[in-house]
Amino acid sequence: MNNIRKNHPLMKIMNNSFIDLPAPSNISSWWNFGSLLGACLALQIITGLFLAMHYTGDTTTVFSSVAHIWRDVNYGWIIRYLHANGASMFFLCLFIHIGRGLYYGSFTLTGTWNIGIILLFTVMATAFMGYVLPWGQMSFWGATVITNLLSAIPYIGTNLVEWIWGGFSVDKATLTRFFAFHFILPFIIAALVLVHLLFLHETGSNNPLGTSSDSDKIPFHPYYTIKDLLGLLLLILLVMMLVLFSPDLLGDPDNYTPANPLSTPPHIKPEWYFLFAYAILRSIPNKLGGVLALISSILILAIIPTLHMAKQRSMLFRPLSQCLFWTLTADLFVLTWIGGQPVEYPFITIGQAASILYFALILILMPMVSLIENKMLKW
């Protein structure tokens, strides 16, 4: 019998990627976050599309158009809050997904890992530009401060900033181009996700043991489709609780004040998911040094496969490395907290210590401990 699922050109691709895909039999719930990220991306594109239908990218009417979405559009408030809190869930899943990759050694699949880093940068750029669009105080000043960092680049910095702004300050030209880029980037992200999956399916998934699972594979459907569905239901529960009970929990009250170039908010800070990088940026007194540290804090992920000294791929049976991994996690929590605090004693000192620890853990301590573990295991 001619099976359409296995022979139709389009269905065949879907079948080989989501139905008959051979998957390791022992992957845990930490492997759910890839599908959850896909769900978050779909949510963001759909809600974003409906928001764009009612949004105006002009500085004189933009704040009113966002208020109009809340007040006058049918279910506009829930669409807007789903989009705003959906971004938070996106980054939560993203950080856990990266953490799982670090813990279980998935970074040894370098193709998939590198596309993942490009995806991370693209998602961060999209989220930053999206935060500017409501044109509240924090939107305006966040855009001013972050784009201004590019002026630290020698020779071309000032010209580059003015080119991005489309003038001599953040204004109408900046808003319209940010809206255009914010609209197009999620589709570029979706294309990159397909490349990410393409590279992943070339090698197959890693598993908690970090060993080859060629001898023990099971079909993706129904086992992992059901498992992913449970994760999806829990994510929906979490998002809906956030949206319906405390939608402004992760936002900034300053963003309910229309953008005013003549009045600076007391504490300019980005959304919570950028605070760790913002804390690293602020911990260096030099502007160019801060920008380099900011970029390095993300780009450091690219050299992790090179720094992998352990003979075992996963951290599952490496207790010393586990201690350092959870120290790194705690350090990121500290950096996130510091990023939201004012620039004063003792927060400056704590931020500097946490920043040094962040780089020291990844560049020095983790490779050293891996070598010690190799010795202990007589490898």
Swiss-Prot record:
<keyword id="KW-0999">Mitochondrion inner membrane</keyword>
<feature type="binding site">
    <location>
        <position position="201"/>
    </location>
    <ligand>
        <name>a ubiquinone</name>
    </ligand>
</feature>
<dbReference type="GO" id="GO:0005743">
    <property type="term" value="C:mitochondrial inner membrane"/>
</dbReference>
<feature type="transmembrane region" description="Helical">
    <location>
        <begin position="347"/>
        <end position="367"/>
    </location>
</feature>
<feature type="transmembrane region" description="Helical">
    <location>
        <begin position="33"/>
        <end position="53"/>
    </location>
</feature>
<feature type="binding site" description="axial binding residue">
    <location>
        <position position="196"/>
    </location>
    <ligand>
        <name>heme b b566</name>
    </ligand>
</feature>
<dbReference type="InterPro" id="IPR016174">
    <property type="entry name" value="Di-haem_cyt_TM"/>
</dbReference>
<comment type="similarity">
    <text>Belongs to the cytochrome b family.</text>
</comment>
<feature type="transmembrane region" description="Helical">
    <location>
        <begin position="77"/>
        <end position="98"/>
    </location>
</feature>
<keyword id="KW-0830">Ubiquinone</keyword>
<protein>
    <recommendedName>
        <fullName>Cytochrome b</fullName>
    </recommendedName>
</protein>
<comment type="subunit">
    <text>The cytochrome bc1 complex contains 11 subunits: 3 respiratory subunits (MT-CYB, CYC1 and UQCRFS1), 2 core proteins (UQCRC1 and UQCRC2) and 6 low-molecular weight proteins (UQCRH/QCR6, UQCRB/QCR7, UQCRQ/QCR8, UQCR10/QCR9, UQCR11/QCR10 and a cleavage product of UQCRFS1). This cytochrome bc1 complex then forms a dimer.</text>
</comment>
<keyword id="KW-0812">Transmembrane</keyword>
<feature type="transmembrane region" description="Helical">
    <location>
        <begin position="113"/>
        <end position="133"/>
    </location>
</feature>
<feature type="binding site" description="axial binding residue">
    <location>
        <position position="83"/>
    </location>
    <ligand>
        <name>heme b b562</name>
    </ligand>
</feature>
<dbReference type="InterPro" id="IPR027387">
    <property type="entry name" value="Cytb/b6-like_sf"/>
</dbReference>
<keyword id="KW-0496">Mitochondrion</keyword>
<dbReference type="GO" id="GO:0045275">
    <property type="term" value="C:respiratory chain complex III"/>
</dbReference>
<keyword id="KW-0249">Electron transport</keyword>
<dbReference type="InterPro" id="IPR048259">
    <property type="entry name" value="Cytochrome_b_N_euk/bac"/>
</dbReference>
<keyword id="KW-1133">Transmembrane helix</keyword>
<feature type="transmembrane region" description="Helical">
    <location>
        <begin position="226"/>
        <end position="246"/>
    </location>
</feature>
<keyword id="KW-0679">Respiratory chain</keyword>
<keyword id="KW-0479">Metal-binding</keyword>
<dbReference type="GO" id="GO:0008121">
    <property type="term" value="F:ubiquinol-cytochrome-c reductase activity"/>
</dbReference>
<dbReference type="Pfam" id="PF00032">
    <property type="entry name" value="Cytochrom_B_C"/>
</dbReference>
<feature type="binding site" description="axial binding residue">
    <location>
        <position position="182"/>
    </location>
    <ligand>
        <name>heme b b562</name>
    </ligand>
</feature>
<dbReference type="InterPro" id="IPR005797">
    <property type="entry name" value="Cyt_b/b6_N"/>
</dbReference>
<dbReference type="InterPro" id="IPR036150">
    <property type="entry name" value="Cyt_b/b6_C_sf"/>
</dbReference>
<dbReference type="GO" id="GO:0006122">
    <property type="term" value="P:mitochondrial electron transport, ubiquinol to cytochrome c"/>
</dbReference>
<keyword id="KW-0813">Transport</keyword>
<keyword id="KW-0349">Heme</keyword>
<feature type="transmembrane region" description="Helical">
    <location>
        <begin position="178"/>
        <end position="198"/>
    </location>
</feature>
<dbReference type="GO" id="GO:0046872">
    <property type="term" value="F:metal ion binding"/>
</dbReference>
<dbReference type="InterPro" id="IPR030689">
    <property type="entry name" value="Cytochrome_b"/>
</dbReference>
<dbReference type="Pfam" id="PF00033">
    <property type="entry name" value="Cytochrome_B"/>
</dbReference>
<keyword id="KW-0472">Membrane</keyword>
<dbReference type="InterPro" id="IPR005798">
    <property type="entry name" value="Cyt_b/b6_C"/>
</dbReference>
<comment type="function">
    <text>Component of the ubiquinol-cytochrome c reductase complex (complex III or cytochrome b-c1 complex) that is part of the mitochondrial respiratory chain. The b-c1 complex mediates electron transfer from ubiquinol to cytochrome c. Contributes to the generation of a proton gradient across the mitochondrial membrane that is then used for ATP synthesis.</text>
</comment>
<keyword id="KW-0408">Iron</keyword>
<feature type="transmembrane region" description="Helical">
    <location>
        <begin position="320"/>
        <end position="340"/>
    </location>
</feature>
<feature type="transmembrane region" description="Helical">
    <location>
        <begin position="288"/>
        <end position="308"/>
    </location>
</feature>
